[in-house]
């Protein structure tokens, strides 16, 4: 599957939107990609999970588990781990969830042994904040992050993720704006909070 095909999957599923959107980062964008609309389809999830697991294998990584930030990364982490488990010994899937104080935490049932390696997965990276909070939650339990993998990398700067190897199925850059930077053509559109 080519990079163009990944974007086509979003469009075909009605998961690529044009308008004016307030992103989780607080920035505004003329585009929004709603991965849950796409990933509710098992065939799309299997295809994307397969591409991501192949990227991980091609990079020579052999994680003990895959972690995704809740909610969007939960099914993705499971599917990537499932497909990696066809090649590697029992790769687990876990998720990190909000802890109520701006960070993330793991459920008690997700035991991480010190030194276990993991890859963190995400659907769309805009700032990387959610993924970084998930990584830090696992590192706080003794896990060692050996890579990051996403479907779409929208970041225009490496930012806080620069210390980790990143793999993506597609890089897609379009401008985002702070509220005081929104150009007139975009300001004319109704703002949709997502």
Curated annotation (Swiss-Prot):
Give the E.C. number(s): 2.4.2.10
Q: Does the keyword Glycosyltransferase apply?
A: yes
Keywords linked to the UniProt accession: Glycosyltransferase, Magnesium, Pyrimidine biosynthesis, Transferase
Top-level lineage group: Bacteria
Q: Which cofactor does it need?
A: Mg(2+)
> Residues of the signal sequence?
none
Q: Which reaction does it catalyse?
A: orotidine 5'-phosphate + diphosphate = orotate + 5-phospho-alpha-D-ribose 1-diphosphate
Q: What does this protein do?
A: Catalyzes the transfer of a ribosyl phosphate group from 5-phosphoribose 1-diphosphate to orotate, leading to the formation of orotidine monophosphate (OMP).
Show the PANTHER family listed in the entry. OROTATE PHOSPHORIBOSYLTRANSFERASE, URIDINE 5'-MONOPHOSPHATE SYNTHASE
Instruction: Specify the protein name.
Output: Orotate phosphoribosyltransferase
Task: State the organism of origin.
Answer: Deinococcus radiodurans (strain ATCC 13939 / DSM 20539 / JCM 16871 / CCUG 27074 / LMG 4051 / NBRC 15346 / NCIMB 9279 / VKM B-1422 / R1)
